[in-house]
Amino acid sequence: MGFTEKQEALVNSSSQLFKQNPSNYSVLFYTIILQKAPTAKAMFSFLKDSAGVVDSPKLGAHAEKVFGMVRDSAVQLRATGEVVLDGKDGSIHIQKGVLDPHFVVVKEALLKTIKEASGDKWSEELSAAWEVAYDGLATAIKAA
């Protein structure tokens, strides 16, 4: 069974909830990542020289890009059944030394952030849709 129209709609609608407070959710997202993988801090140019996770234009832009890429993955999975990356998105992850465990940490942070943004709209079905979309993106990044 492919990615369904309902799954795509769930990802799209909840990604809009993230956009309602991107500063707060961006800080939450990276805080969760660094709690789980403190050494990942050096992989992010906008975090490596800071004392902690603080809101900044670069942090917010990167978080919005990550969540946007997962949303775009949902669209691609629904349309074609696979995720194809644009440009250098895959190679930059290889250059930064991103390994399989990092993808697991980011997935967990992504789901916790969307859960927070979704509030009472959160469900197992919503979680599953984000997981499938993220896994499709992660697979494409690893294959690049």
Curated annotation (Swiss-Prot):
Keyword Lyase attributed: no
Sorted UniProt keywords: Cytoplasm, Heme, Iron, Metal-binding, Nitration, Nitrogen fixation, Nodulation, Nucleus, Oxygen transport, Phosphoprotein, Transport
Function: Leghemoglobin that reversibly binds oxygen O(2) through a pentacoordinated heme iron. In root nodules, facilitates the diffusion of oxygen to the bacteroids while preventing the bacterial nitrogenase from being inactivated by buffering dioxygen, nitric oxide and carbon monoxide, and promoting the formation of reactive oxygen species (ROS, e.g. H(2)O(2)). This role is essential for symbiotic nitrogen fixation (SNF).
Localisation: Cytoplasm, Cytosol; Nucleus
SUPFAM superfamilies xrefs: Globin-like
Main location: cytoplasm
Source species: Vicia faba (Broad bean)
Positions carrying Phosphoserine: S45
A Pfam family it matches: Globin
Tissue: Root nodules.
Organism lineage string: Eukaryota, Viridiplantae, Streptophyta, Embryophyta, Tracheophyta
Binding locations of O2: H62
Entry GO CC: cytosol; nucleus
Protein name stated in the entry: Leghemoglobin-1
Family of this protein: Belongs to the plant globin family.
Subunit structure: Monomer.
Residues that, per the record, bind heme b: S45, K65, H93, K96
Domain Globin per the UniProt entry, residue ranges: 2-144
GO terms classed as biological process: nodulation; response to abscisic acid
Stored InterPro entries: Globin (IPR000971), Globin-like_sf (IPR009050), Globin/Proto (IPR012292), Leghaemoglobin-like (IPR001032), Leghaemoglobin_Fe_BS (IPR019824)
Modification(s) after translation: Nitrated in effective nodules and particularly in hypoxic conditions; this mechanism may play a protective role in the symbiosis by buffering toxic peroxynitrite NO(2)(-). Nitration level decrease during nodule senescence.
PTM sites of type Nitrated tyrosine: Y25, Y30, Y134
One Gene Ontology molecular-function label: heme binding
